[in-house]
Amino acid sequence: MFRYHSILLLAILYFFEYGLAYKILVFSPATSKSHLISNGRIADELAKAGHNVTLLEIDFLGIVDSTKSAKLVKKTIVRVPKKMQGFKNVIQSFSEGVMEDEGLFELLKGNIAYQTVYNDLCEEFLENEVMFNKLKDENFDAFFAEQLNICGFGYAKALGIQRKFLISSCPFFSHVYDYTSHPAPYASVPFISDMSPEPTYLERTNNLLRGITINTFFYFSHNRLTSIFRKKFGDDFPAITEIVRNVDIIFLATDEIIDFSSPTLPNLVHVGGLGVDDDTTEMGPVFEAEMKKGDKGVIYFSLGTIANTSTIDKKVMESFLEIVKKFPDYHFLIRADKNDKNTKDKATEISNVFVSDWLPQPAILHHPRLRTFITHAGYNGLMEAALAGVPLITIPFMFDQNLNSRAIEKKGWGIRRDKKQFLTEPNAIEEAIREMLTNPSYTKQAHRVRDLMRNKPMGARDRFIKTTEWVIQNGGVHELLTEGRDLSIIKYYNLDIIVPCFFVAFYFIIFPFFKLFGGFYYYSCFGHIESKYKKD
């Protein structure tokens, strides 16, 4: 009898643990290792909550097998060999031009190249009918995908998945605002171009023009993506932007404490830092020994993967190594590409530096002897540093990095420097390090940011899981979708009212005023001359 009751109790517990579990598909194209890791964290968090998660990784770059993206969820891998090299070439071109200032033409050219080959990869992926049918048979309850390209949402629609969640893997960019028909705050947030803390007229103009240009490009890119799906699934397949416009929730992988404060949406939820603490592992004896060096502490330096130290101008790293020599009381940990022989050779001549192609970043950031992190301001590293309370010296190169660095500067827990200063003004970077090491305000503010993030009423994990389950349980929450998403630009901004009113005002008020004023001015200035001629 006791055995019977025990089995019954276990069965009941199993039901409550797994009986309400949902089947969820996480769509994760391999656009970079950092994006694979971010999506892996999402999959793991859903799995921890008891859900049945499929992590679908499409190998755009040949990096899926070597990237430990998820710890709990088994990966389903799809190869796209035909177009892979084209995508690799685009990423390589970004790395080669990373030190150049990006004008509007270069910005547009880069986006066209990236989205064009991404759409090609999407089309190749759709040819895999075996995988499509296998996934369709799963009858997933929900779907997650990033914003870099919205191919995944067309795929989810074709699979018949009802509940869709958009992951904005970096700050909310202008074209993502455009998906939702929510006006982007170009006057205050440097989406596409750099803007100083108090933006000038020209800076705001440049940001606006770039934003309009990029949004116009995405309009045509999305039309092509729609045509790809209609070619595969029929002419009645909905426009890809219509699918995205009606996603249930937008999860923003940033934190409102460190991001630019700007207008938001009812269905937008911040989940910055999701899964970050789980990656804080032991660093091992080799790195632990390095962290003990330096009389006054350790400084960590990493420029990410796009600013590849083996392809950028070698003078960049040589310049930084010269700066390292000026801080003998501090030990520097430098991440350099595995093929960067020049940096490694030069570093052997310097006693207070350790160079490696891999460093346990989360563990380093949480180490008590770390004084500052010199970074390119990629969002993964930024979130890790924020949760560890580490002040930053940011040197942005491209993509969202400039936006991130300006937000850090504005919130007071970091110093920003320009990438060109490695070559033209290295003393500016040296001065930033000295300022960071001697001014405690940056560390104090970094600790405040950490505490605010960690002590929020609801953390990222609870927000993410509870919101996801709430939406699925209720068959979507259409009540949160903004009414403006279905309006045209003309209606949304009331241009059909404003423009006619302007012409009416011009005709009945402004035009008569100028006519009267002009006649008076003409008579007062030239009337006496005409009178004189008439008398003569």
Curated annotation (Swiss-Prot):
One protein family per Pfam: UDPGT
Location in or out of the cell: Membrane
Primary location: membrane
GO molecular function, one term: UDP-glycosyltransferase activity
The keyword Membrane is assigned to this record: yes
Keyword check for Glycosyltransferase: yes
Keywords: Glycoprotein, Glycosyltransferase, Membrane, Signal, Transferase, Transmembrane, Transmembrane helix
Record GO cellular component, one term: membrane
Transmembrane annotation, as ranges: 497-517
EC assignment: 2.4.1.17
Topology of this chain in the membrane: Single-pass membrane protein
InterPro entries per UniProt: UDP-glycosyltransferase, UDP_glucos_trans
Family: Belongs to the UDP-glycosyltransferase family.
Protein name: Putative UDP-glucuronosyltransferase ugt-47
Organism: Caenorhabditis elegans
Gene name in the database record: ugt-47
